[in-house]
Curated annotation (Swiss-Prot):
Biased composition (Polar residues): 227-245, 270-296, 403-413
Region annotation (Disordered) ranges: 1-23, 166-477, 496-517, 532-691
Cystine residue pairs: none
Protein's name according to its UniProt entry: Uncharacterized protein NCU10291
Source species taxonomy: Eukaryota, Fungi, Dikarya, Ascomycota, Pezizomycotina
Compositionally biased intervals (Basic and acidic residues): 304-322, 550-560, 637-657
Family annotation (Pfam families): PLAC8
Transmembrane intervals: none
Positions with biased composition (Low complexity): 682-691
Length: 724
């Protein structure tokens, strides 16, 4: 068992990538990450940790760790981390985060120690969680970019894997020419004729039908001169031969170079001796020999943009040699295609009669207006209206009427009228020839001219002096003065003011004085009197005199109520005789002198009441003049129905002797608030003369007295309650 553990341990250690010394974290510990990474790491660290663990599991399974499509929230890893956060006070989750950091560091060979990972996981747990997730995302993204195949170059033999063409699609021909068809044409050799012998002219051409045959040179005697020395020789650096050879090797031709070659050849083919054929033109017809038959003097070809681009050097050989040369070789026509022949500019204008023989090249062209549209060159020639001085002519063959032979497999159809008109104007502006148009187009031009010459309403300048509307308003002074105000001119001479007091109309004198309040028509007559308005004389004002007129004294004010309070009166307030002084504030109230108060209830100060002084509470005595307690007859408790003391035969209570007994109703179960010694017992012997009938009469009288006293007591209590 130990051998198996020892054998598996080196394998696990060797499977980990070694630590690279310079391999450090690509993400800083304090990198905030994306917008939601920082809040998730602080408030939902379990979710951030679960995402990182899920990415590591995808790497272990060989899947894309950046694809979280199958990730499920609230997985077991998330709940486990949540339990460590809440139960271990973040120490357990910090250790868990440190172990995850160590795992990531060992996987990518990042330098560091496990102790540092644990420390950062405990004390910087959100930062460690963000760095772990960002590190995996960045390293795996860089790895995927490095594993992509390199882009395939788009060469001549490249074919796309998928080529979807819609119905009716017609592909454009490729801008290439098969190798072997283009052959460089050598320039004529420079030769000097010997004395007395005619100059020989060498012409290099291709035989028709033998496109791949070598060049054949033919010598023809030159009459009346010798061949001009051309600057475009094979020995010239950057000349056409070098360019042609390079193009032959490449087999391509740009549209700009093709257009430049065509323009240069069209300008020089009538006066230039040499290879004027455009060998790079895509055509199915075999090339022909081109030799000029013009009587014009021989001159060197005019350098084109191709020459300026590839051979910028100009030497003394570029000077023109004006030597007439005659030749019987048929003229060559440049062929754009098999169906159409494009005439040159000289051929087009040679067919147009000169309407102005006296004009020169420097004179501006005289052309009528050319509105409307033109037809194709295949239409009948245009005619001039009857009576016109213009000579009938035929429309020239316009270059715009022919198709291009470089970008389309089919010839172009009928060109637009605007294109023909533009081309015709461009051609006409280069020559003093006159081109006419049809009658309908001439009438349109005349109509446009008439409309342009028609007088308009607003053509003449506007003169303010001729405007009759400006004479109605007289000139007025712009300055505003109150004494001559124009707005008051409509008022009658005698302005009137309305007096609201007398309700009469009083005329105001018209005085040439300064404008003031007393002259204003809107001010009442009362305002004209410059005097103070007394408040006393105004019967419409009922307000009292203001404080500024007289001083207000409280002693004279009979309407001020004196506030009543228990505090002593303030000085000055007692002068008001309408407020009586309450007697309660003058002397204290003695309850003993109040005859209306019956036996009061016990007060807080436990005031002792002398029952002997209260003659109304005494019981009438029997057999005595004065009766009651004053007569000296003892009071028996057994006769008192309101006293809750247990009736004992041997206990005779004497009220006269008990001067400290508390007053008030006593309940049968009431107890004395303070324990005190019982009064001395006095044994009173019954009178021998007292019979049973006398005792019953006395008891009845005592009950009646108690009944009356009870009514008085209740009435006194009601009065005391109302007063309080």
């Amino acid at each position: 068992m130990e051998d198996r553990e020892m054998s598996t341990k080196p394998e696990s250690i060797s499977s980990r990538p070694p630590e690279i010394p310079d391999n450090d974290w690509k993400i800083s510990l304090y990198d905030p990450g994306d917008n939601d990474d920082c809040p998730r790491a602080c408030f939902l660290p379990c979710d951030m940790f679960a995402h990182t663990r899920y990415r590591l599991d995808l790497i272990k399974q060989g899947r894309d760790p950046l694809d979280l499509t199958d990730y499920k929230d609230f997985n077991p890893t998330c709940w486990k981390f949540f339990g460590l956060c809440t139960g271990g006070f973040c120490i357990g989750s910090g250790i868990y985060t440190g172990r995850e950091t160590t795992r990531i560091r060992q996987k990518y060979g990042i330098k560091g120690t496990a102790g540092d990972d644990m420390t950062r996981g405990i004390f910087c747990q959100p930062c460690s969680l963000i760095r772990n997730d960002l590190e995996i995302r960045q390293r795996e993204g860089m790895k995927q970019e490095a594993d992509l195949p390199p882009p395939r170059p788009l060469g001549e033999d490249y074919q796309p894997i998928f080529a979807i063409k819609p119905d009716g699609y017609k592909s454009e021909p490729r801008m290439t020419t098969p190798r072997g068809i283009l052959k460089p044409i050598a320039s004529p050799e420079i030769s000097s004729p010997p004395d007395g012998q005619p100059a020989l002219r060498e012409v290099h051409f291709h035989e028709p039908g033998q496109g791949n045959a070598p060049n054949v040179a033919a010598s023809y005697p030159a009459e009346g001169g010798h061949v001009s020395q051309s600057s475009f020789s094979p020995r010239t650096e950057g000349g056409p031969s070098t360019v042609n050879q390079r193009r032959s090797r490449e087999g391509t031709l740009t549209p700009i170079e093709e257009a430049d070659n065509q323009a240069g050849e069209e300008r020089n083919k009538s006066t230039t001796l040499g290879p004027a054929m455009n060998t790079f033109q895509r055509t199915t017809s075999p090339p022909v020999m081109h030799v000029t038959t013009s009587d014009a003097p021989i001159q060197a070809p005019t350098p084109t943009r191709d020459h300026d681009r590839y051979g910028n050097g100009r030497g003394p050989d570029t000077d023109r040699l004006e030597v007439p040369v005659q030749s019987n070789t048929p003229a060559r026509k440049s062929r754009f295609s098999e169906e159409f022949d494009a005439p040159s500019a000289d051929e087009m204008f040679s067919k147009i009669p000169d309407a102005a023989p006296s004009s020169t090249l420097d004179a501006p062209p005289r052309l009528p207006q050319l509105p409307g549209a033109f037809d194709t060159p295949a239409m009948p020639p245009a005619t001039v209206p009857a009576g016109s001085s213009d000579v009938p002519s035929q429309l020239p063959q316009l270059p715009g009427a022919f198709p291009s032979s470089s970008h389309s497999e089919t010839p172009n159809m009928k060109p637009s009228a605007l294109g023909q008109l533009t081309a015709l104007r461009d051609v006409a502006n280069q020559s003093p020839k006159v081109v006419t148009v049809e009658e309908a187009e001439t009438s349109i031009a005349e109509t446009i001219q008439d409309e342009a010459d028609e007088a308009q309403v607003g053509d003449r300048p506007h003169d303010n002096s001729q405007d009759p509307q400006l004479d109605t308003l007289p000139p007025r002074d712009t300055r505003h003065r109150l004494n001559i105000d124009e707005q008051l001119a409509f008022l009658p001479p005698q302005a009137e003011a309305h007096d609201s007091g007398t309700n009469t109309v009083v005329p105001l004198p018209d005085q040439p004085e300064a404008h003031g309040p007393h002259m204003d028509a809107k001010v009442a007559l009362a305002a004209a009197r410059i005097k103070d308005h007394p408040i006393e004389s105004d019967p419409r004002i009922n307000s009292p005199k203001p404080i500024s007129i007289r001083n207000h004294e409280f002693t004279e004010d009979k309407r001020l109520a004196v506030p009543r309070s228990d505090s002593p009166f303030k000085p000055g307030i007692h002068l008001d005789q309408r407020v009586p002084t309450p007697p309660a504030l003058v002397r204290p109230h003695n309850r003993l002198e109040d005859r209306q108060t019956a036996t009061p209830s016990p007060s807080a100060d436990r005031e002792n009441r002398n029952l002997a002084a209260d003659v109304r509470t005494a019981s009438p005595g029997l057999g005595s003049r004065r009766g009651g307690l004053m007569g000296g007859r003892p009071h028996s408790l057994r006769h008192d129905s309101r006293v809750g003391t247990p009736k004992h035969l041997e206990n005779v209570h004497d009220l006269a002797a008990d001067v400290r007994a508390p007053t008030g109703p006593v309940t049968p179960l009431a107890k004395s608030p303070e324990p005190r010694s019982p009064p001395p017992k006095r044994l009173a012997a019954a009178s021998p003369a007292l019979s049973a009938s006398s005792i019953s009469i006395g008891t009845r009288a005592h009950q009646l007295l108690e009944h009356f006293l009870e009514g008085n007591r209740k009435a006194a209590e009601r009065e005391n309650g109302n007063k309080s």
